[in-house]
Amino acid sequence: MYRGCLAIPYMRWSPWRHWTVAAIRYRRIDGGTPKYLSMPGEKDRLYNTYALTKYSKDMAICEGELDTITAELCGLPTVGLSGAQKWKPYFRELFLGYRNVNILADGDDAGMEFARSVAKTLPNARIIPMPEGEDVNSLVTSQGKAALLERI
């Protein structure tokens, strides 16, 4: 079932075990559908919560694990959600201490809807839209790291 998929681990901190895998999502890389697979019964979680443990004045939020990884590789502390409808009100408290929470919105209607739904719950939110038809990963892949950082 998961053969030919990229395994994306969701990590969790435990004082007894340190960082451990809490869940795994799978990204199909063979072009099949559905594009993403989750283990049955999985809960909505933030991806890359390690970013929340490092000192930073700003934090970014992405829709999608691959966009989150790309933003992190560009030097932006970033957490991600597995989809546009996955923001939960209880996530809010984790982001209130930052100067800015940059919501890196995909360049489509769903991306802007995601960004607005998150932004309305955070007083320190800034929506950073990607160009039409682009997401963080495609922007950096086609135009380089500077293209993303200039938008911030």
UniProtKB/Swiss-Prot annotation:
Q: Which CDD domains match?
A: TOPRIM_primases (cd01029)
The record's annotation in InterPro entries points to: TOPRIM_DnaG/twinkle, TOPRIM_dom
Q: Which SMART domains match?
A: TOPRIM
- Where do the Toprim domain residues begin and end? 57-137
In Pfam terms, one family for this protein is: Toprim_2
Output this protein's name. Answer: Gene 57 protein
The organism named in the record is: Mycobacterium phage L5
Top-level taxonomy: Viruses, Duplodnaviria, Heunggongvirae, Uroviricota, Caudoviricetes
